Amino acid sequence: MNHIFRRSIPITARLPSLGIRSLATATASAHPPVQLYGLDGSYASSLYTAAVKESKLDNVEKALNKLSGVLQQRPEFEQYISSPWLTREDKKILVSSLTQMTGNEPLLKNFYNVLLDNHRLYLLTRIQKQFSTLMRAKRGEIEVKITSATPLDSKILSRLESRIAKSKYGKGKLLVSNKVTPSIIGGLIVEIGDNILDVSVGSRLNNLNKLLSEPI
């Protein structure tokens, strides 16, 4: 049978041999700060646990962020790593390239091998995003995305940030960004973590203030 059709190796069975313990056996200090869901969340959580135990959280985060930048600049490379038709030699070359891109970190090299063995390399971008979620939670950071039809000036962004910080949603360090989407006509979409507030520009900040003032 062609090796690409092999049965997937369970993550909890494969990771321990690489020094990556499952969440069930992780110590309290190494436990991820928030629970993630999905296969990408499971891999990100296992990588987080391993990085904590080896005191390599910052190194792994920087390396994955760097890799994410490369994949964004070279979409053809992301298509390649997602291909189910890679030969054994292709895989060796691929792991070597990924390892070099991320600073020759042994922990990540092992992790890439786990993904390859399980035919899950296509999850790499999503795993990076999930890992970033864990790191933001560890630092007590809250991502705030404000989508508008045109760029918002610094005064408006400051007012929004100030109001959110005083609301039930502002329990942490806010990381505010403004995304411009012309199709958002006459409105703002404010994403605070997992919460989404759709606010009409016609009433300016009144509706937003009302939403933010609601009791928890």
Curated annotation (Swiss-Prot):
UniProt GO BP: proton motive force-driven mitochondrial ATP synthesis
InterPro entries per record: ATP_synth_OSCP/delta_N_sf, ATPase_OSCP/dsu
Superkingdom field: Eukaryota
NCBIfam families: ATP_synt_delta
Subunit structure: F-type ATPases have 2 components, CF(1) - the catalytic core - and CF(0) - the membrane proton channel. CF(1) has five subunits: alpha(3), beta(3), gamma(1), delta(1), epsilon(1). CF(0) has three main subunits: a, b and c.
Family stated for the protein in its record: Belongs to the ATPase delta chain family.
Name of the protein in its database record: ATP synthase subunit 5, mitochondrial
